[in-house]
Amino acid sequence: MEKARPLWANSLQFVFACISYAVGLGNVWRFPYLCQMYGGGSFLVPYIIMLIVEGMPLLYLELAVGQRMRQGSIGAWRTISPYLSGVGVASVVVSFFLSMYYNVINAWAFWYLFHSFQDPLPWSVCPLNGNHTGYDEECEKASSTQYFWYRKTLNISPSLQENGGVQWEPALCLLLAWLVVYLCILRGTESTGKVVYFTASLPYCVLIIYLIRGLTLHGATNGLMYMFTPKIEQLANPKAWINAATQIFFSLGLGFGSLIAFASYNEPSNNCQKHAIIVSLINSFTSIFASIVTFSIYGFKATFNYENCLKKVSLLLTNTFDLEDGFLTASNLEQVKGYLASAYPSKYSEMFPQIKNCSLESELDTAVQGTGLAFIVYTEAIKNMEVSQLWSVLYFFMLLMLGIGSMLGNTAAILTPLTDSKIISSHLPKEAISGLVCLVNCAIGMVFTMEAGNYWFDIFNDYAATLSLLLIVLVETIAVCYVYGLRRFESDLKAMTGRAVSWYWKVMWAGVSPLLIVSLFVFYLSDYILTGTLKYQAWDASQGQLVTKDYPAYALAVIGLLVASSTMCIPLAALGTFVQRRLKRGDADPVA
Amino acid sequence: ELCQPGAENAFKVRLSIRTALGDKAYAWDTNEEYLFKAMVAFSMRKVPNREATEISHVLLCNVTQRVSFWFVVTDPSKNHTLPAVEVQSAIRMNKNRINNAFFLNDQTLEFLKIPSTLAPPMDPSVPIWIIIFGVIFCIIIVAIALLILSGIWQRRRKNKEPSEVDDAEDKCENMITIENGIPSDPLDMKGGHINDAFMTEDERLTPL
């Protein structure tokens, strides 16, 4: 009575789905940041090494498991051993947490996209103050882009404790984001397979357009030189290696069960080794490509700010010393400064504190990642471009495509195990199951649209997935290599695809990858313990900048719960299976 | 002696002609000063009780090459200066006219201590973003509704199909007609014919 499993229409759809899932916002807003922090071009060395020894093997492993077992994460791991069904459950729980907060990014992208159709862009100017003689104080102290992000978008509260209410604007955008996701997953692989053509390819179109624009921007070379100048000494920094490994790990989306779910819709004869290599290479290539774009725009922004700074200093000097208008230029500024300092020492020293120190280097050094990069720094660059509306629309459209592509993978990781389960799917049609999942997620996601929502977003972003995923993937590799048996798995794969598994993969699966994950796990765990009390960045409206605050006790409790609720699934499910078997045997014994 | 830097009721003015106009910048000379005085006198005459202000009542001093200078407005007797508040409000009311006379703007023609009123941003009654939101929202809703309805319709057809003969199929179509309240027989017939070939294939692939 086994029903035929739905399949991808062709293997291209599968590859596109994997690319669309793996290539996400992390490639655009995390990798450039890591490059900047860990030695520019030389970061590529640990990154590529980690890609080969960690990323590719683990990706191959997950795809192979999915394709072999032909089930979502829960079913696949239960088939390998009933004691391991907790791994699948943990994956589903983590995916659930992830999709809960991840779609808020899409909501923000929608919000910025909708606001891009205005002239001037709303984040390019500060609103006026009450009597129309100046600008809003908070906006003046921060910047117009920061103001639009913290005040207009988030309307952020001063601390985590002050919740505020749900705000209708972001709430509407979140609702829309979930409806879009629902539209894409409504029919399972049938509709997802078609959507991924767009979500996987359109970001590249936008990136290419941006690359052409970026390279022709004034000052782009400053940014590119900054990025590609290798700082070799960073290779000796263990943090560079750890961050490279972590970036590869999370950027491929291992452990969420999405890849297992996607691969489960493959023909068993599919050559998943080839696909694993293609997907991981494209993912890394996209990261590098996106960094080139990001850094050319970064260079533009830094040069623009640097020249603006020089102009401000010139204006200040011109005004104070009543110099002829237009006499001061960037080239004679230092010379004139020296002259003025010696000619009018008292007047000069009086105004000296107001003279800003303009430096292109320090402008380039300010490293930003995550939402700060996308919604504050990028918008700042965009607002200074010509036809800024067009670039803004393109950029946020790309963010949306990337975000929705990843959401499709996240929801597949939840839905595939649910639709696989006979109890649920016999009562409810697929549309209803996915609708319910979206509804529940959207309802919980409303937490992130409150005034303190961004702080909760940070909590989820920092703690919901990191440790749990490492543990899940560790157990996965051990399960395949030592519980299921590497030989058995190897012969399964050979029977399935008709190819022998090369020794390289076996060495990586059985030895190198688990060791790497263990060392990452130990590093992060000790890092958390050593930092002591966890802190977060709160927005101070009166200063117009971020300040560091301690998490309140209940936030710490939530963090603990987040980590525990996913990781505890593994031992609890094993324990449950054990007890169940004991009871069964207990029942069976007297009869026998 | 009424006009000097920092004197009572005196205002400093700063012009950045080169910044604003580049190569088309004009030189600041006595003619321009005359125009400036005229503009200030013109502004003052609009203030109640100051209709008698003449160009000669506006005094300039300390003109620098920046171009910056100080000015005061005196009363007709030329013995004392007019209160700062009046000058301030007169200039604020006519700032735009003064700017235009010199081809400058608020940034390049600065009256220190006289903040210029900034133009409020355009504020449409319905925010633009909500309109775009509405359009996209409606499209998505319609698309979802269509997909779900077509899914239900497909499922109904499929459920009925295996249950033998044409009789059953007729019955099913009748049911649909009744449910929708629209006599859509020809449409259903047509759909049935076209989809026949796919039905068996679908059945093999799509689970329920």
From Swiss-Prot, chain A:
Residues 27-42, 101-165, 216-241, 298-389, 453-465, 526-554 are extracellular. Coiled coil: none annotated. CDD domains: SLC6sbd_SIT1. GO terms for biological process: amino acid import across plasma membrane; amino acid transport; amino-acid betaine transport; glycine import across plasma membrane; glycine transport; L-isoleucine import across plasma membrane; L-proline import across plasma membrane; proline import across plasma membrane. Residues 1-5, 64-79, 187-194, 263-276, 411-431, 487-504, 576-592 are cytoplasmic. InterPro entries: Na/ntran_symport (IPR000175), Neutral_aa_SLC6 (IPR002438), SNS_sf (IPR037272). It is a multi-pass membrane protein. GO terms for molecular function: amino acid transmembrane transporter activity; amino-acid betaine transmembrane transporter activity; L-isoleucine transmembrane transporter activity; L-proline transmembrane transporter activity; neutral L-amino acid transmembrane transporter activity; proline:sodium symporter activity; solute:sodium symporter activity. It catalyses: L-proline(out) + chloride(out) + 2 Na(+)(out) = L-proline(in) + chloride(in) + 2 Na(+)(in); L-pipecolate(out) + chloride(out) + 2 Na(+)(out) = L-pipecolate(in) + chloride(in) + 2 Na(+)(in); sarcosine(out) + chloride(out) + 2 Na(+)(out) = sarcosine(in) + chloride(in) + 2 Na(+)(in); N-methyl-L-proline(out) + chloride(out) + 2 Na(+)(out) = N-methyl-L-proline(in) + chloride(in) + 2 Na(+)(in). The keyword Ribosomal protein does not apply. Mediates the Na(+)- and Cl(-)-dependent uptake of imino acids such as L-proline, N-methyl-L-proline and pipecolate as well as N-methylated amino acids. Also transports glycine, regulates proline and glycine homeostasis in the brain playing a role in the modulation of NMDAR currents. Belongs to the sodium:neurotransmitter symporter (SNF) (TC 2.A.22) family. SLC6A20 subfamily. NCBIfam families: Na_transp (NF037979). It is linked to Hyperglycinuria: A condition characterized by excess of glycine in the urine. In some cases it is associated with renal colic and renal oxalate stones. Iminoglycinuria: A disorder of renal tubular reabsorption of glycine and imino acids (proline and hydroxyproline), marked by excessive levels of all three substances in the urine. This is Sodium- and chloride-dependent transporter XTRP3.
